[in-house]
Regions:
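NAD(P)+-binding Rossmann beta1-loop-alpha1 motif at the extreme N-terminus of oxidoreductases
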Residues: 2-54
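Phosphate-coordination loops involved in phosphoryl transfer and adenosine-cofactor binding
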Residues: 7-10, 99, 158
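Active-site phosphate/pyrophosphate- and oxyanion-stabilizing loops and adjacent acidic/basic residues
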Residues: 50, 91, 127, 131
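Short beta->alpha connector loops
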Residues: 82-85, 145-146, 167-168
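Rossmann-like NAD(P)-binding element
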Residues: 56-61, 66-101, 105-113
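Rossmann-fold NAD(P)-binding glycine/threonine-rich loop
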Residues: 106-153
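Internal alpha-helical scaffold of NAD(P)-dependent oxidoreductase catalytic cores
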Residues: 132-142, 156-194, 198-203
């Protein structure tokens, strides 16, 4: 079992009612972090939070809120929405992210079979996030290649997470969260390298 993190640090998981977001929220709540699940529909976020608390037998601090409210309450924000909602979600929480760390899990997969990626003009979803948010937000890309099925278990998982980001400091902070989730994090360099990691997702699927 991981060392418990102080409950002073709050992580918001935007789009946290989806499988990937819920799995990450479960992992961090299990490790002792305070977690706020965000959603376009706050009621769904509240339900997801209740389900996680039940899985952890009530021994966690998890609440549900709108995406904006979740972003406002957290020091670290994790974005787990489908690519179709990527830009709109970021625009909606942009002001709340200033001075914070954003971990972008989004991959620009082409629906419905999601067997290929279509990179945006910015280069990758993470680079697009950086372009939208500007210099006031540290942006990191991570967790794109981890199955939600591995996350919703009560044990460590032998999975590697490649972490790319806008600064060494931001990548180091993100790797701490990777390890808190029971995974192994690797510094994969600057955010421009996120195009490689995002592109790998469709191959693994």
């Amino acid at each position: 079992m991981e060392e418990k993190a102080p409950l002073l640090l709050t992580i918001a998981v935007l789009g946290g009612t989806g499988k990937e977001g819920k799995g990450l929220a479960f992992r961090w709540a299990r490790a002792g972090y305070k977690v706020v699940i965000g959603s376009r529909i706050p009621e769904k976020a509240v339900t997801a939070a209740s389900e996680i608390i039940e899985l952890l037998e009530g021994s966690s601090s998890v609440v549900g809120a709108s995406n904006l409210e979740a972003a406002e309450q957290a020091e670290i924000v994790v974005l787990t929405v489908p690519y179709a909602a990527h830009r709109d979600t970021l625009e909606g929480v942009k002001d709340a992210l200033k001075g914070k760390l954003l971990i972008d899990v989004t991959v620009p997969l082409v629906p419905p079979k999601v067997s290929k990626v279509q990179m945006p003009p910015a280069g990758s979803a993470a680079q697009e996030a950086k372009a939208i948010l500007g210099e006031d937000v540290q942006v990191v890309a991570a967790f794109q290649n981890i199955s939600h099925e591995h996350l919703m278990t009560d044990s460590d998982v032998e999975c590697d997470v490649l972490v790319t980001g806008s600064s060494k400091e931001a990548r180091t902070e993100a790797i701490k969260l990777v390890e808190a989730a029971g995974l192994t994090g690797w510094d994969a360099g600057p955010i421009e390298n996120s195009v490689v990691v995002e592109g790998l997702t469709s191959v693994l699927i």
